């Protein structure tokens, strides 16, 4: 489950809670993985990783959520974990106004899907290409159904299973609107 591959996760400030500043909640692509491949300690561990990375980058206090789905009984959709939007990158550029836009005609691309420190993530054409993001999700942000593991055992395994990935630069995907 991605044990030997460097993969990233996307983190979003949950906007279900009031945002005192009136600004969109930040959205970032993590610059650092757990060091254990797809074993992020489940959703709670992944959320803690997002919170830790945000705190280290002095991002405003939010309830941080990893953009990850889980499978099986009690499965969770990534799109349902991150609030209603809007979301902006750490430089204030709005990447999506709402959940529908986030999973459709959004502004997520190589120049806007920044790390928590505001750095561009290496993508297609860069060495190394680090655009793979763990999601365990379909392009619309819902969990993948069926018996094939696409979440590294719901983000608790690094030696077995597989993970569905997205691309932070949105290149190399199919040409459908949700995949772009």
Q: In which residue ranges do the predicted regions lie?
A:
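Bacterial N-terminal signal peptides that target proteins for export
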Residues: 1-2
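Secreted/extracellular ectodomain signature
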Residues: 13-180
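C-terminal motif of bacterial Sec signal peptides marking the signal peptidase cleavage site
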Residues: 7-10
